[in-house]
Amino acid sequence: MVKIRLMTINDWKGVEQVWKDHEGTNPVDDCEEGFTRYLKRNPATSFVAVDGDRIIGTILAGHDGRRGFFHHVVVAPEYRKKGIGEDMVKHAMEALEKEGIQKTALVVFEDNDLGNGFWEHIGFTTRPDLVYRNKYVK
């Protein structure tokens, strides 16, 4: 039976495996050091879905004090379409709300039809008035 629980630093190996099995993650950004730093800054807002001892889903969630952010919402292919992603999002939204966060955002690749369909299905809207930009610090 699949259960949703708080993500911990000790989950790194299982989380890393789920991310490696999923397109769209970046080994430069998604290293153990970055994962640990993120969870230390946001200790109560990220969750994993587990089936027995196996991590089969992740939602890395946090905030900057005013806006929540979701990263790497991933469910192993054989577990998709069973409500697990929605359950993880619900847990993360409730955790963010407890910390006083009213709104959350995320980035999805434009050609990720499965991901975009999921977010639309659960009520997330696109912002055609925004352009996403980034730049490496060094």
Language-model features: where?
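A conserved beta-turn-beta hairpin within the catalytic core of GNAT-like acetyltransferases
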Residues: 62-71, 80, 126-130
